[in-house]
Swiss-Prot record:
It is found in: Cytoplasm. GO terms for molecular function: ATP binding; ATP phosphoribosyltransferase activity. This is ATP phosphoribosyltransferase. Heteromultimer composed of HisG and HisZ subunits. The lineage of its organism: Bacteria, Bacillati, Bacillota, Bacilli, Bacillales. It holds the Pfam family HisG. It catalyses: 1-(5-phospho-beta-D-ribosyl)-ATP + diphosphate = 5-phospho-alpha-D-ribose 1-diphosphate + ATP. PANTHER family: ATP PHOSPHORIBOSYLTRANSFERASE (PTHR21403:SF8), ATP PHOSPHORIBOSYLTRANSFERASE ATP-PRTASE (PTHR21403). Its EC number is 2.4.2.17. The gene is hisG. Pathway: Amino-acid biosynthesis; L-histidine biosynthesis; L-histidine from 5-phospho-alpha-D-ribose 1-diphosphate: step 1/9. GO terms for biological process: L-histidine biosynthetic process. InterPro entries: ATP_PRibTrfase_cat, ATP_PRibTrfase_CS, ATP_PRibTrfase_HisG, ATP_PRibTrfase_HisG_short. Signal peptide: none annotated.
Length: 214
């Protein structure tokens, strides 16, 4: 049985990806979208979904417990896992930027950057010749400049509303982010025909979506 195991994040990305799979011609029961199960079997399509936290998707794919997965580019840039990036799905679009209190310069001696993306932040500041101290946080990143913990934050920006509501402004654009289809290298060889067919069908949906926005 040539079953495909697909790892996907719970929440908004799953909802958008589910709709895209439907448009691509996959027959998925309606209850899949509303299910609270962490593992969902679709025998008719020979597909199994594993639903997890966004940061865990590339881990499952790299270790082969999932053949393919859908992960944000932010997660892929941060983790640098051994996976194949097959397709930009053009969903959950946002970007990574630095932000801080308005009209404030970074500390010249030891600027501190708060973020949940330590590798992305370090690579960015190293690339522009800034020596910084990275403070890793897991939530409420916007608090860091407000309470004097950091000069800047590096975080995902979608609409900019959260920054504005907390009195912060953007300083530097770092990278665009969208959801990507990734594959385990061994699965890509062993189940290449199925995976390539999936990519072809999803790519058609992505192109149609883009043409509708022109």
């Amino acid at each position: 049985m040539n079953e495909l195991t697909i790892a996907m994040p719970k929440g908004r990305i799953f909802e958008e990806a589910y709709q895209m799979l439907l448009k691509a011609g996959f027959h998925l029961p309606e209850e899949v979208e509303m299910s609270r199960k962490l593992m969902i079997e679709i025998p008719e399509e020979k597909i199994r979904f594993i639903l997890s936290k966004p940061m865990d998707v590339p881990v499952y794919v790299e270790h082969g417990v999932a053949d393919i997965g859908i992960a944000g580019k932010d997660v892929l840039l941060e983790q640098q896992r051994e996976v194949h990036e097959l397709l930009d799905l053009n969903i959950s679009n946002c970007y990574i930027a630095s932000a801080g209190l308005p009209n404030t310069d970074m500390n010249e001696i030891a600027p501190r950057i708060a973020t949940k993306y330590p590798n992305i932040a370090m690579k960015y500041y190293k690339g522009i010749g800034e020596q910084v101290e990275i403070i890793e946080l897991n939530g409420s990143i916007e608090l860091a400049p407000m309470i004097g913990l950091a000069d800047r934050i590096v975080d995902i920006v979608s609409t900019g509303r959260t920054l504005k509501e907390n009195g912060l402004v953007e300083y530097e654009f770092i990278s665009t982010v969208s959801s990507r289809l990734i594959a385990n290298p061994v699965s890509y060889r062993m189940k290449g025909e199925r995976i390539i067919d999936l990519v072809r069908r999803l790519k058609k949906c992505v192109n149609e979506q883009k043409s509708n926005h022109i």
